[in-house]
């Protein structure tokens, strides 16, 4: 039942050794309530550039959705002022091409979905904080 799933998830979090993070990073759970899986090491993604869509309170953009980017998504993001194509070495950002996996901002992905250009999502590697902005049902429609 749904209630027992919530209980199991809460129990797992409490008993899981990674629950307490000294770095201020929020606990690493995905939108399915399981341990967060890596998103990409090539290119190396994540707010912390650790390959995962981890987040903390300083990540105002919530870079938490693990996507396999597409040309329509990249063009949409650029039109919105979020250029994910052009390399920015000072931010350790290589620039993305279609097929790359990247932790994108939850609001950018939500806006792209509303515009009909959402890209595929890896649910296992998408941080649960994404659910502040995007419904699980919508994410599931674009699951890899």
Which residues make up each language-model segment?
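Short, small-residue-biased leader/transition segments that mark boundaries at the very start
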Residues: 1-7
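A charge-rich, low-complexity, intrinsically flexible signal that marks solvent-exposed coils, linkers
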Residues: 22-144
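Intrinsic-disorder-associated, low-complexity terminal segments enriched in Asp/Asn/His/Tyr and depleted
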Residues: 12-16
């Amino acid at each position: 039942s749904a209630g027992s799933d919530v209980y199991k998830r809460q129990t797992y979090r409490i008993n899981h050794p990674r629950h307490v993070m000294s770095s201020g990073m929020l606990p690493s759970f995905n939108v399915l309530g399981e341990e967060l899986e890596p998103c990409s090491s090539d290119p190396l993604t994540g707010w912390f550039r650790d390959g995962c869509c981890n987040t903390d309170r300083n990540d105002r953009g919530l870079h938490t959705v693990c996507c396999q980017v597409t040309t329509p998504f990249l063009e949409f993001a650029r039109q919105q002022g979020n250029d994910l194509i052009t390399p920015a070495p000072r931010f350790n950002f290589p620039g993305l091409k279609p097929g790359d996996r990247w932790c994108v901002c939850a609001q950018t992905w939500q806006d792209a979905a509303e515009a009909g250009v959402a890209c595929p999502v890896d649910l296992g590697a998408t941080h649960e904080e994404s659910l502040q902005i995007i419904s699980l049902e919508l994410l599931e429609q674009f699951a890899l």
